[in-house]
């Protein structure tokens, strides 16, 4: 496609999405639920065919020398597809918040003032690798009464095309416009530049991918952006704590999966429990091949662990998102130092405290400036499905509009409604 053809194509996508968004905004709740249930059924019925399409993407990715974490994110396993189907069903079962009026109060003038939940309109999702994002974005768009334009990575084109076809079939079955979910069918990066500069058609941009992609979109977009740049998540092991529980959680937070943005990248340990805790978690990390980049005090303790992969930590390690079997380790005085360290080096994504001290837990929840803060649970729970949102379209570390996992409410806004009986202002 030349530039003129690309401009015409993206404009056509935007115009069709805008038309579809008006229909979706007034779609009955039953129709949206029907579409989501139909999509769940189609995902299950077509799992073998979807895996064939996904295998083509995986083969091309490996041949192109894509990094292992990117290839891992690209995979559509039967479990991944089942999770997507369950997410659709969970969304279908949730109450429809569109059109609901909240906080209606009568004013001295006699008018009643409240706020109504309404769809954003059209959002454009720009993402890399993970084809399951196609279903997460589409299902949330349907439930929230929006239209969406999906621009997945070129490495996942076959998977995304197959998934989008199923979404459009489900929309048609429910009597909803197929243009409510459209996939950008070109891998030309200039298409992204055009979509993020179309405020007359696109109301919101949600990038989900590498830091370079998100920085570029944040810099060039002419419409609002919901984003997070990094996932430098922390586990802080407090004193006192249940050591066995802390070992289990710290293991899960790091090694359950290395590539997600909610995997723990930094392990902070209170000095009173370091000598007992670090050898135990160090042995597990050593067995699983996790490299530990540690402060001098932690290195001295971990040095006795057989097979431990140890390196001295640098200043950069405290703020690094590894997305790999690497973790930074630091021994601290206690909760004050942990909170200060997290607020300085964290990406404000997800951070957790493991403790038996109620006051420390409450301070951590109040004072750590992150989108999700957890007590005695793995950072891997920072996920829309796990939070009961049905699915998530991304995780926002911004402080305005949406923060944390973005589900249905994050794809809506509130407008004021005023009910009167002929009142006039004096």
UniProtKB/Swiss-Prot annotation:
It holds the Pfam family Aldedh. It catalyses: L-glutamate 5-semialdehyde + phosphate + NADP(+) = L-glutamyl 5-phosphate + NADPH + H(+). One of its GO terms (cellular component) is cytoplasm. It comes from the Bacteria. Pathway: Amino-acid biosynthesis; L-proline biosynthesis; L-glutamate 5-semialdehyde from L-glutamate: step 2/2. Catalyzes the NADPH-dependent reduction of L-glutamate 5-phosphate into L-glutamate 5-semialdehyde and phosphate. The product spontaneously undergoes cyclization to form 1-pyrroline-5-carboxylate. This is Gamma-glutamyl phosphate reductase. It is found in: Cytoplasm. One of its GO terms (molecular function) is glutamate-5-semialdehyde dehydrogenase activity. Gene3D superfamilies: Aldehyde Dehydrogenase, Chain A, domain 1, Aldehyde Dehydrogenase, Chain A, domain 2. Its main location: cytoplasm. GO terms for biological process: L-proline biosynthetic process. Its EC number is 1.2.1.41. The keyword Metal-binding does not apply. Belongs to the gamma-glutamyl phosphate reductase family. The keyword Amino-acid biosynthesis applies. It is an enzyme of class 1 (oxidoreductase). Keywords: Amino-acid biosynthesis, Cytoplasm, NADP, Oxidoreductase, Proline biosynthesis. The lineage of its organism: Bacteria, Pseudomonadati, Pseudomonadota, Betaproteobacteria, Burkholderiales. CDD domains: ALDH_F18-19_ProA-GPR (cd07079).
